[in-house]
Amino acid sequence: MSASASTAADFVRFALDEGVLRFGSFKVKSGRISPYFFNAGLFNSGRSVGALAGFYAQALVDSGVAFDMLFGPAYKGIPLATATSVALAGHAAMAGRDVPFAFNRKEAKDHGEGGTLVGAPLTGKVVIIDDVITAGTSVRESVEIIRAAGAEPAAVLIALDRMERAGPDDALSPHSAVQDVARTYGIPVVSIASLADIMTLLQDDAQFAEHRAAVQAYRSKYGV
């Protein structure tokens, strides 16, 4: 499930402008050589994170998913949940709703408030927010935390769906990591944009035409 076409297109342009999305030849975590690379860690200033949060908020509103709060898994999800909560508070479609958020620590504190959870109590329908889904480990841990607190995972919200099958080349999964998460936990995965939106840019903008064939070949081999 992706955001609206206009939101997705604007986000792809934004990611390119920020140097977060690049074309070339990159060895990614899976060991594959990818013709594009998306590094959300390069959203690292107040301006860029503020704009990113606006895209997350719009994608969540576009999705129509019913939710009560946000959860950001440590560590990357922490600033994403925080900033997106702020963006939602100012979103016209939210009608003044003040969306709470929480996140976890990797290690429990034994002083102060203690425990592994920080922020609002986990209650109601909770949206997990992260940058991408690679192996689904972060989502699994988040679902366990949310359910243990008596709350309900409502959706996973990510920046980019790579639409890519997992596994070695001689034993590729028929599903992507995003599809596996949706099937395993019975919840939608909402992305601001996807590889399909990147391909649309490559097809429509002559500036990036030189990368079109490589990305299409990669998608044909590994895509879903």
From Swiss-Prot:
5-phospho-alpha-D-ribose 1-diphosphate binds at residues 29, 75-76, 105-106, 109, 111, 130-138. It holds the Pfam family Pribosyltran. The gene is pyrE. Keywords: Glycosyltransferase, Magnesium, Pyrimidine biosynthesis, Transferase. Gene3D superfamilies: 3.40.50.2020. GO terms for biological process: 'de novo' pyrimidine nucleobase biosynthetic process; 'de novo' UMP biosynthetic process; pyrimidine ribonucleoside biosynthetic process. The lineage of its organism: Bacteria, Pseudomonadati, Pseudomonadota, Betaproteobacteria, Burkholderiales. Catalyzes the transfer of a ribosyl phosphate group from 5-phosphoribose 1-diphosphate to orotate, leading to the formation of orotidine monophosphate (OMP). Transmembrane segments: none annotated. The keyword Glycosyltransferase applies. InterPro entries: OPRT, Or_phspho_trans_dom, PRibTrfase_dom, PRTase-like. GO terms for molecular function: magnesium ion binding; orotate phosphoribosyltransferase activity. Homodimer. GO terms for cellular component: cytoplasm. Its EC number is 2.4.2.10. It is an enzyme of class 2 (transferase). This is Orotate phosphoribosyltransferase. Belongs to the purine/pyrimidine phosphoribosyltransferase family. PyrE subfamily. Pathway: Pyrimidine metabolism; UMP biosynthesis via de novo pathway; UMP from orotate: step 1/2. It catalyses: orotidine 5'-phosphate + diphosphate = orotate + 5-phospho-alpha-D-ribose 1-diphosphate. The keyword Ribonucleoprotein does not apply. It comes from Bordetella parapertussis (strain 12822 / ATCC BAA-587 / NCTC 13253).
